[in-house]
Amino acid sequence: MRVSPAATLSVSLTTPLPITLTKARFSGEPLRLKQYVLSNQICSRPKHLLSEFKPTRRWTFSCKCRNRGRNGYAKFDDEGEDFIVVNFYRFVSIGDPEAEIEKHLSFLKDLNIRGRIYLNEQGINAQYSGPSKDALAYVEWLKGDDRFSDLLVQMSPAMNRHAFPKLKLQNKPSLVQYEGGISHLPLLDPPMRAKPLEPSEWKRKLKDLTDDDEASPSNSGKSYILLDVRNGYEWDVGHFRGAHRPEVDCFRNTSFGLSDEKEAPSDPLINVDKEKTDILMYCTGGIRCDVYSTVLRQRGFKNLYTLKGGVSHYLKEEGTAEWVGNLFVFDSRLSLPPAAYNDNVVDKAVGDNVVDEAGRTPQTPVDTSFARCYLCNSQVQELRHRNCANLDCNRLFLCCAECVVDLKGCCCSDCISAPRLRPVLHGVKRYEKWHVYRDSEEQNAPLV
């Protein structure tokens, strides 16, 4: 089932509301039942049962409640608002996730927030955007619960608009996607996770261990391994010095330390002494390291350390020490320079380049070993990925300005002739939904 053009919802509650159901044109992948989705385009009290409708039909909502404007749209005025993006997670036992979701829905119903908030029996994982007053109101409300009172919250600028298209509040089996799921992992047992290091401790440890690279270039002789537990394309725009590019494009497929030497010779954990080697793990916000460290712990790795709060927390507290480039983020911004997290590193991070209020910059990389165009291998001038213009590909890739023009915004020559080709985007822009371009072509088509 899919609804369009407004944001949609699919829940398993039965409280009746004044919602009118109307037909709409198909606009993409189907909805999932029992998935709560809120936005500023639908009723703020989503409690209508959808499971009675056939999944072969297309529907959209037109809410007639008093909180709506014309055509059922919410009355949120974003003009002049100071938007931020908020990220946090917590592994904690939640006995009744559905009841917990109801509490969150009740509080969020009147807030202008969009993003992803996942809950289950193991805790919560949230990334969302909104006006600062609304975004922080949710944080303060959550901290009123003893289970979340000391929650570590990451914040960054959101370009004065939402960084997500809608808000999903969902009871999800896995707080992060990993092959085989994570419900069986001992995430609620802190000793089974890596030991968290404060940013200052992490910085000091990296500095103290730098000499090991020169003294022992092979893994077998090192006293530590710096492990980037992200995707390769994230490393391409920024990473800690000394961290090798992860040969993975999706965290769910991460398998460091799980294969023998014959199967994965490029595994950075091959031939390391599991008893004596310090494994220093980092990711964007920390949750992927917490998850994967339990996997490594079960495989016999003893000395596991993680960067508390991830790279975003480190940049805020320590600036760019030992870090090079930008930080990839999983929202419409795609990439942020260190200055977005710490104003004091502007000069050091980007020199004379101009940083706008969103923290964007045409920063030229200082490390020429990364930030390469995926097509011609030249140095890119902007540390930000783009999506392939071919809708059916949509690959994230780094590209220089020349290749953008030559390949019409596509990631390869094969995509240029694709039937659903979107226009070339220049600068920091994101593609709209396909129907925007399709309808535009239909309107501009000559009459016959």
From Swiss-Prot:
Keyword Plastid recorded: yes
Record GO cellular component, one term: chloroplast
Gene3D superfamilies attached to this UniProt entry: 3.30.70.100, Rhodanese-like domain (3.40.250.10)
Annotated compartments: Plastid, Chloroplast
Keywords: Chloroplast, Plastid, Transit peptide
This protein's record includes keyword Chloroplast: yes
Residue ranges of every copy of the Rhodanese domain listed in the record: 220-323
Transit sequence range: 1-23
Catalytic residues (positions): 283 (cysteine persulfide intermediate)
Record-linked SUPFAM superfamilies: Rhodanese/Cell cycle control phosphatase (SSF52821)
InterPro entries to which the protein is assigned, alphabetical: Rhodanese-like_dom, Rhodanese-like_dom_sf, Rhodanese_C, TrhO, TRHO_N
Domain of life: Eukaryota
Name of this protein: Rhodanese-like domain-containing protein 8, chloroplastic
